[in-house]
């Protein structure tokens, strides 16, 4: 199997993982900022990042923002976010199926949705 998942320790975040699948070209970071109110809820952004650091910074910033948004809305969800680096890659069903495999490894701690450049049709590939 070509899926590789590495956990990244970041102070103030419950879990941050970086997942690579060489076969499907997946390069994603999922950041779970906080699950005190419930599982982390946040979208997956498909974006062209120039570097790993830029991608990670975006995931961290956005997942913390989702914690605040979900809390302000008084819903029972924490905050999380996923970002997929699509620089030089095609968005394919296999890419999003591979992303779904990564989400499943979090065992319900992160719930995904659409976000910038990730559409319903892309997420239909995850089911």
Would you name each region that the model predicts?
Residues 1-127:
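N-terminal ligand-binding/catalytic initiation module
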